[in-house]
UniProtKB/Swiss-Prot annotation:
This is Cell division control protein 6 homolog B. Belongs to the CDC6/cdc18 family. May be involved in the initiation of DNA replication. GO terms for molecular function: ATP hydrolysis activity. It holds the Pfam family Cdc6-ORC-like_ATPase_lid. It comes from Arabidopsis thaliana. The keyword Nucleus applies. Coiled coil: none annotated. It comes from the Eukaryota.
Length: 505
């Protein structure tokens, strides 16, 4: 091989250039320790012909996709043949890309999936709430930079990530203040529902600012705080204080005066309080902002919207991605996300539904008897749509679902036919077209179909019940038919019956 010494030096420089931390000594030892192919005579001649009496050239442990820029294609091939490093790299990549086999009978796997879906499992990254976190962080950061008190009101329905986002922001504020060389911010988190008396919140704030100091008998904790923030403090005690009042709507139902007094603490001339109130009541700001505005303590408002179907699905997928096996059918997760988003957008409820579906599969697997239950786990032994539908039925029960479940079989077949017909861009069809699909389903399952007159009458009944919409036409077959209910409701209502589950595939 020509220019061995030059090539080895170039290869080593290339390794250093891309940030490899392997030292030359370790590379030399690696070159001697790695098993080598038997040398051919041509190789021996090439080595003996080299006048440079240096150790064997240093070999780059980079894959062939990152060769030495100074080497030709032929040299790369020869170099790769000299040291057997590729089988090792391929084995590692194969291991990294292989998914483990999922088995609902494996207690360790089942425990890991349940843990990943538990409400108390705080993810490292709060997905779909990045904008809200940035706004909260910038608000707190601005107050600290200006050494100025302020108030913020965070509202949103339960399960929309408010408390979780606040925990993340508190961590970010601590990291930022440390990096900026600023004094740490004192943080007080209070769940208002845990207070024996609503006025106890002032005692907690006072205890955080002045540890061990109780208000004297002549003044209440609130009065003590008002006096404290009305006069200039010593520089040693001028640290900012972040107060997070969770479940703040509890104060509204108990004592609105406490709510007003709490926000007014941020308006005092020497106040160092950064107040963040968190509540489920979205209309709280609308009901009490006028009063707070008149008191010159109107807070900034950030609303956490309910999670959409796509957001719920993304969060569920992210939680399950840490597992080395697939435990849920993708369509089952989509069904959960769609139903929860339509009902409430509560992420905690979506997690509970998924855990419930997993438990249904677990019970089903344990309940199976016979010799076949001792064999290998079937490939479809994941959480399917029927498991998810059963779990959803425990949580949600809409009148539409109950109506569909109570219908006669042939009317349910018509609904399934309509759901299949309108899955794409097509939103309606004629009675005749729908009847053709109905007949195909009946024929495939060897069910005696109803005649066209009876079929038309059943469509009229479904129209009266608000499930189908049947238009007007001179001939019954030409009447336009469309669905009035969501396909997810149909799937949800009928998935527990195997016949309909297969019809909806």
């Amino acid at each position: 091989m020509p220019t061995n010494a030059g090539t080895s030096l170039s290869s080593y420089k290339h390794i250093v250039a891309i940030g490899t931390t392997v030292k030359s000594e370790s590379l030399e030892s690696a070159a001697y320790e790695i098993p080598r192919k038997r040398k051919m005579r041509s190789d021996s001649a090439a080595v003996s012909g080299n006048s440079v009496s240096t150790p064997k050239k240093l070999k780059s442990h980079l894959p062939s996709s990152v060769p030495n820029p100074g080497m030709s294609e032929k040299e790369v091939v020869e170099d790769s043949n000299e040291i057997l490093r590729y089988p090792v790299n391929l084995a590692v990549s194969d291991c990294l890309g292989t998914k483990s086999k999922w088995s609902p009978r494996d207690e360790e796997q089942m425990r890991a999936v349940k843990e990943a879906l538990h409400v108390s499992k705080a993810p490292s990254t709060i997905l779909c709430r990045e904008d809200e976190q940035i706004r909260i962080f910038e608000f707190v950061k601005g107050c600290i930079d200006q050494q100025k008190a302020g108030s913020l009101y965070i509202c949103g329905c339960p399960g929309t990530g408010k408390s979780l986002s606040m925990e993340k922001v508190v961590q970010q504020v601590g990291d930022w203040s440390t990096q900026a060389g600023l004094p740490p911010v004192d943080t007080l988190s209070v769940n208002c529902t845990s207070l024996s008396k609503t006025t106890d919140i002032f005692s907690k704030i006072l205890g955080e600012i002045k540890p061990g100091k109780n208000a004297n008998t002549n003044s209440s904790p609130l009065q003590h705080l008002q006096n404290l923030f009305s006069q200039k403090q010593e520089s040693s005690s001028s640290r900012m204080m972040l107060i997070i009042a969770d479940e703040m709507d509890y104060l509204i139902t108990k004592d609105r005066g406490v709510l007003y007094d709490l926000f007014m603490l941020t308006t005092l001339p020497f106040s160092r309080c950064i107040l963040i109130g968190v509540a489920n009541a979205i209309d709280l700001a609308d009901r009490f902002l006028p009063k707070l505005k008149s008191l010159n303590c109107k807070p900034m408002v950030i609303t956490f919207r309910a999670y959409s179907k796509d957001q719920i699905l993304r969060i569920l997928q992210e939680r399950l991605r840490v597992l080395s096996y697939v435990a849920f059918q993708p369509k089952a997760l989509e069904l959960c996300a769609r139903k929860v988003a339509a009902a409430s957008g509560d992420m905690r409820k979506a997690l509970c539904v998924c855990r419930s579906a997993l438990e249904i599969l677990e019970i089903e697997t344990r309940g199976s008897t016979g010799p076949e239950s001792q064999g290998p786990t079937p490939d479809d032994s994941v959480v399917r749509m029927d498991h998810m539908a059963a779990a959803l039925s425990k949580t949600f029960k809409s009148p539409v679902v109950e109506t569909i479940q109570s219908l006669p079989q042939h009317q349910q077949i018509i609904i399934c036919a309509a759901a299949k017909a309108f899955r794409g861009s097509k939103k309606d069809a004629t009675v005749g077209e729908l009847n053709k699909l109905y007949l195909e389903i009946c024929k495939s399952w060897m069910i005696s179909p109803a005649g066209i007159t009876e079929f038309t009458n059943m469509c009229t009944v479904l129209n009266d019940q608000g499930i189908l919409k049947v238009g007007q036409a001179r001939r019954d077959k030409l009447k336009r038919v469309s669905l009035r209910v969501d396909e997810s409701d149909i799937t949800f209502a009928l998935q527990e019956i195997r016949f309909f589950r297969n019809c909806l595939l």
